[in-house]
């Protein structure tokens, strides 16, 4: 009989140890807290203001972007476009109402499609073409200012533009690249674009001359809204020569400078035909984009470089890594909280992308009633911009549950756009790169945690 009892107990023990609910997110008790760990996802998906992008350029008074074209981008996991306006008809005159209406229509369609743009204006696409005077540029920016303010929610970043061929601050016919004129134009750009919008200049020297220092800013400046904190970089000959066709003056020093600055301001652009260097391999591209913290890259140019990455199986990896890619490794809470008390919420957040988030977001802990589904949003102090690549961010918050009735609630994390126009749009919410936690209909990330308020 004793032998039978021992065998029965052994069977129960084995059965218990083999049980599994099949969930990849596992819970455990630690120091009285319920800890859940999460599986990282390898899926390619979109997130706002980052990734590979398509370029759409349009001449003066041309056709607006079609809704169908924008909606098709979602099939490519693209959330960002470069919208380049050539103002060749207006080198000596104000912008027409037709031109202004074109820009307004584009912004409306971007918003309807759930996308954003990198914005640039230029007067010519030819090296021997002409640009406009400082006075004309200033007048055009005055005309654009109210439109830009109204539509700042769908402007991810702005490339400085206006000067020279393609708006790349070279080949000017109006002496726009003298130190005095560069300062006038940058001052006007910073005044005309909303303070929330970061402006990218073509070379590090342009910014260094403007702010009168070669020392990269620190976090005290970088997370603010000063002019220094608003100037990032775009490179339209990325990895194409030793100095990227004149992008760098002192290559090593300039790259270090951009790497440090890019903790706070965006870098992005496109490749171009290589000169006296081999085409950028997967390993070279990985190294450069990691160092310089690239957040977006043009899909439409330069084709042979992009094909090199496709042929060597790193293109998909770059789809994941361009910009930010946030994931949660674990979260911990106390399962029971007193009515109108505070919930101690801890989470470890990682960023496996090349870059941080650059535009401020609003983060909320969502409590959703397990019975009835009523939702309560609790604002967090969490600044998602501070989750930088390769450094685990330790999120610790005491969340007031004032106003939340007694009951059982599941917990979710929402990171939404700072604009009230977009806050409720899932397309503009940050999706975490974890398995099985994204809710596409709400923009919530499920934490597989429940709390009981009593």
Question: Predicted regions span which residues?
Answer:
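Bacterial Sec-dependent N-terminal signal peptides
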Residues: 1-3, 10-37
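Active-site groove signature of glycoside hydrolases
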Residues: 118-127, 144-176
